[in-house]
Every structure is written in structure tokens, then in C-alpha cells.
Amino acid sequence: RMLNQNEADLVYTLDSHIYDTNYINLQEGRIGVHFVCAANHPLADRPSVSLKELIQQPFLLTEKGMSYRRVMDEALAAKSLEIRPVFVSGNTDLIRNLVAQGAGISFLPDYTTKELIAAGKLKYLQVPEMKVEIWTQLLHHRDKWISEPMRIVIDYLHKCIL
């Protein structure tokens, strides 16, 4: 919407894939996202966990409507399921650290958890019933002229985060 109304020159998303012929997709990439728990959690070493069993666990989640949380909620709703979290925060670092301490389970992008996974403090839960795709995309409106400052920002984003 912001691109269509010329309220933004560029948009960098972390969400479900956006398909729109009005937008030029400058860069995109699929982002891994998993349910995670503490390494010593009873579900941690299971080869797979059912959704019905999983949603009975205490959950620490990002705020409702936030990109990957919204995508997860929609996927669960399609199965007539929902998670009622015991803790909600916009602070992903806080959530992942609480999960690592055994406070519950969360659903987070891999780039936020890979450090604690590598350190053996968190584990990914395998939930075969839940296939969710999260994408990063750098978009601009098809009719938008790319100014020199925009080109500099685009080049910076390509070097640093894309």
C-alpha cells in the first residue's frame, strides 16, 4: 500500500511472498523459520511433533500481526487451530533467550536462533504438518524513478543484508 500511494520509495519485507505486477522485486530470499525450544525440553529430541501436541505447550511469541507470527497464525487457522501464548513481546532477543532458559516454545526465523542452535542451547522442532514460507523482498513501485540516493540505499542493502 505504501508503495502504491508513493508514501515509501522502497520496502524491505519479512513476510509471505508478495506477488504484484506493480512492483519491481530487486532482491528476494527465502528465510527459514522454525518452532524452537530449549535443548533440554521434553520435545527437543523427538523426530517429529504433532501440531495438536505442540499447541498445548506454553508459547512465547512476537506480537500478533507481526510478519512471521501472522503467517504462522494464518497457517494454524487454516487447520482450525490456534496458539494462546503465555508471553508476547516485540523483542525477539528476549523471546529466544527465555526459550533457551526453558520458559516455553516459540516460532522464530532461523537468523535469530542460529547462534543458540549452534551453541546447543536451542533445538528446532520438526512439525511435518506445518509448512510455512517466509521471504525477504526489496521492492519498489514499477513507475518509481530510482534517484541517486535510492540507488545508494539499494546498493548498501545488497552488500549488507541481502
Outline where the language-model segments fall:
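Flexible hinge/capping segments at coil-to-helix
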Residues: 23-59
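Hydrophobic residues within well-ordered alpha-helices
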Residues: 2-4, 54, 97-103, 138
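Short beta-strand-centered segments that line the small-molecule binding cleft or hinge
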Residues: 1-33, 37, 100, 123-125
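A late-sequence structural motif
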Residues: 123-162
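Secondary-structure junction motif
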Residues: 44, 58-79, 146-150, 154
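Short helix-initiation/N-cap motifs at beta->coil->alpha
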Residues: 1, 88-95
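Short secondary-structure boundary segments
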Residues: 15-17, 39, 110-112, 128-129, ...
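A ligand-binding cleft/hinge motif common to bilobed small-molecule-binding domains
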Residues: 14-22, 70, 74, 78, ...
